[in-house]
Amino acid sequence: MVGNISNSILISLDLNQLYKIFLMNLHEYQAKKILASSKIKVPAGSLVTSSQEANSFVKANKGSTFAIKAQIHAGGRGLSGGVKIISSAEEACAFVSKFLGKNLITYQNEPNGQPVNNILIEETISISRELYFSIVIDRKSEAVTIICSSAGGMEIEEISKNNPELILSVSCEINKPQNPNDIKEIINFLNINDVVAPQFKELLFLSYNLFIDNDLSLLEINPLVISNDNELIALDCKMSIDDNALFKHTESKGLHDWTQSDSKEKEAHYAGLNYIALDGSIGCMVNGAGLAMATMDLIKLSGGSPANFLDVGGGATSETVSKALKILISDNNVKVVLVNIFGGIMRCDIIADGIVNAVQEVGIKIPIVVRLEGTNVELGKETLNNSKLNIISADSLTDAANKAVEIANGK
């Protein structure tokens, strides 16, 4: 079940934060364009970037009501007023004036919200039923997995928590998504009528192929609605592409909207660093994604809170380390930096040189706790000890986490 998926994730990150680390998220309008190109039905609509365009679209279409949606990389838009049903051009213009170019704050994004650069206006659909449908990578079962529920329009995490019996999870064999028994199980579980069943079978086939062909890590249609005319329509969609596969999809690289990311994330990206901003007070610099998340877990277990995920990679230079530290201290919430390096490919003395250079160049005032292990570790420790800077050596990862937490907590 989907509950097992989220429970397998390391304690330092929630599901949305983990997705951010490895994925390129798309806007709803971008995801729907891809769905439509794959012959999956979506509501007719238009992207607008001005009140004039909104006014023209509403007046040119004969529908009595429209759904107007602010486009940001976060859920909870409806609760914050960012999704609304309108019935006139005047309402459309008022919505655009209120949100376009402004930041929309929801319970899923940062305190300052995210900028609304585009607004989607669509025809409304007369809905008979709302379903939940998604395809994800389930690391527990090591398989592409279809997740569905009869409780569409709700957050799947809430359904999993409160009504897990309403969720069905089906693992797919590679290149064999159309297992007849699985299809029958899903259709029966969702109680889909005979008129809609052929459409649903087609949706399974099309969406699976879309997922595989585009190297997606998430395809979520919520709600997937059955209209009063028995049409199956994707009313809303979230889509994330595995950014490690972008070299195969040059057409997708331009879809990344950097305005939706933390400015430090953009800076780190162009420096070749894997960085995700979080909301804690302990900056983390680690080599290797697995070690980085383990470090963050230990910080949490020690009573602290990580301010970021940062993997400098295995081939970082002194300049890379210096750049990484500058990005870390640009976060005003950071009270201490924890550097945890296992020197295999990367040499500990190079890391130490980068730390010392960054502290001297930028004038870093906050303490830096450093745990080094591996190639040239003694040379690295010697460099740090001789620097006479505010750098605290740690003998182990546990020792480093405890020292960082004590400093962050003012002890």
Predicted regions and their residues:
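Short, Lys/Arg-enriched N-terminal segments with co-localized hydrophobic residues
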Residues: 7-23
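Proline-centered loop/turn at the N-terminus of a beta-strand
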Residues: 65, 365-367
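Charged helix-capping and loop-helix junction motifs
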Residues: 323-325, 351-356
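Short internal beta-strands
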Residues: 367-373
